[in-house]
Amino acid sequence: MLRGWGGPSVGVSMGTALGVLCLCLTGAVEVQVSEDPVVALVDTDATLRCSFSPEPGFSLRQLNLIWQLTDTKQLVHSFTEGRDQGSAYANRTALFPDLLVQGNASLRLQRVRVTDEGSYTCFVSIQDFDSAAVSLQVAAPYSKPSMTLEPNKDLRPGDMVTITCSSYQGYPEAEVFWKDGQGLPLTGNVTTSQMANERGLFDVHSVLRVVLGANGTYSCLVRNPVLQQDAHGSVTITGQPMTFPPEALWVTVGLSVCLVILLVALAFVCWRKIKQSCEEENAGAEDQDGDGEGSKTALRPLKHSENKEDDGQEIA
């Protein structure tokens, strides 16, 4: 039948063999798997459940069981008269041998990786053939967000501040939400980036830019869409009123006193200059008045002598 599948002696491809098998068998064997995706955390073990209903007198020698990736047809695990594994899953897959005879064809996948995510098909052949596919979703919870503030000191109302929310080692990509202190969503001035590391896990950095008020609380929520888990982080910022330290206050007082003294000195100098100028003008005016009176006194005798001469002439 399907003996030897997955081994080096296979002469035809698995897809061709399964196609021939589908044509030859009636499909009376019924394979059942979970309709809901199987969710597994990174680095934990996952069980992909698959079952069939064995007929009375069933023997494992009649069973051919194959697990493979649905899309690529890559072999994951097989059971014919033993097991054969694909290299990508070496030492990481196992069946439940003691339960096979009861119709339990489930696959145990150990130490789940991000790259294990996908659809897996369970093929069961006894005398008839059937198959079914089950989905595996891989997830990893995000760490509690760390909040950083830039600038982080000497903040005043009206300052533009940058708040960064960082969460690490999650999968799949996160959904990030910002809220203010009243629980209202903040969607403007938000920039979010997500980068996968070598294991495929994401580091999230979301940046919010806001104008600081008198005080405010800002919350960051990082949601894992598969696990429906939320990681919260928040920061409360208080904008301090403008104050001066004691040193600055003394410097300000000293400068003010110096400025007052300088203005007083300047006013005194100006007053002295103005006073001196006024005194000089007054002195000049007095000198001019004195010169005028002297001239008048000198002229008076001359007039008197002239009168005498005139008188003399008349007498003569």
Curated annotation (Swiss-Prot):
Residues 281-316 are annotated as: Disordered. One of its GO terms (molecular function) is signaling receptor binding. The chain crosses the membrane at residues 249-269. CDD domains: Ig, IgV_B7-H3. It comes from Rattus norvegicus (Rat). Residues 29-139 form the Ig-like V-type domain. Interacts with TREML2 and this interaction enhances T-cell activation. This is CD276 antigen.
